[in-house]
């Protein structure tokens, strides 16, 4: 199972770095920062489906 360590999030701003991750909501996130901010916003209901685009 793929996991991402989101400790230290949310961050106020994310870089534009493109390293896509696919969330359990079937949405592609541009990078870990964007994904982790969304995880925090979801109160932990969002998880990583896999690395790369959905």
From Swiss-Prot:
GO CC, sorted alphabetically, is: extracellular region
- The record places domain Kazal-like at 4-54
Name its species: Coscoroba coscoroba
| Site positions for Reactive bond 3 | 16-17
Keywords assigned by UniProt?
Disulfide bond, Glycoprotein, Protease inhibitor, Repeat, Secreted, Serine protease inhibitor
**SUPFAM superfamilies listed in its UniProt record:** Kazal-type serine protease inhibitors (SSF100895)
Q: Which residues are glycosylated?
A: 43
Copy the domain comment: Avian ovomucoid consists of three homologous, tandem Kazal family inhibitory domains.
The cysteines joined by S-S bonds are 6-36, 14-33, 22-54
Q: What is this protein called?
A: Ovomucoid
Where is the protein situated, by its record's location annotation?
Secreted
Q: Give the matching InterPro entries.
A: Bifunctional_prot_inhibitor, Kazal_dom, Kazal_dom_sf, Prot_inh_Kazal-m
Where do the coiled-coil regions begin and end?
none
GO molecular function terms attached to this record: serine-type endopeptidase inhibitor activity
């Amino acid at each position: 199972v793929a996991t991402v360590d989101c400790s230290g999030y949310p961050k106020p701003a994310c870089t534009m770095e493109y390293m896509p991750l696919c969330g359990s909501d079937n949405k592609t996130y541009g990078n870990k920062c964007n994904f982790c901010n969304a995880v925090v916003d979801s109160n932990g209901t969002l998880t990583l489906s896999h690395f790369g685009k959905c």
